[in-house]
Amino acid sequence: GAACLGAPLSHDFAVISLSDCMTPWELIKKRIRAMAESDMVMCIYNPSSRRRAGYLKEACDIVMEVQPPDTVCGYVRNIGRDNETAGVLTLKELADFKADMFTTVYIGNSHTKIINGKMVTPRGYKVV
């Protein structure tokens, strides 16, 4: 899914599910805060469901306590399916984005940027 956006995971990153079926929501929120404070790119799966409609917004609000609202983010819906869609947006826009269980969300770090319309987290190599 990440390749649909460009190269958002080309440095350290963390993956988390927003499903609270097996993990309490309070623990998930604690982990999201730690991830945001670590300045790692985040990959979020199970971002929303009918029962958890507000979890992605709440997760974004937690991240915005640490990172600016214009942090580069992205989403890919229906990865590998005929109706696959992907987009790049800001953290503030992501907070209001209507994700579903078929969506994977990516929140960039302080180095993530948009290059030629793609979400890119550089590894620090210099082009010579």
Q: Over which residues does each language-model region extend?
A:
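Class I SAM-dependent methyltransferase SAM-binding "motif I" and its flanking Rossmann-like core
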Residues: G1-V41
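A contiguous loop/helix-start segment that scaffolds small-molecule binding in enzyme catalytic cores
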Residues: E37-V128
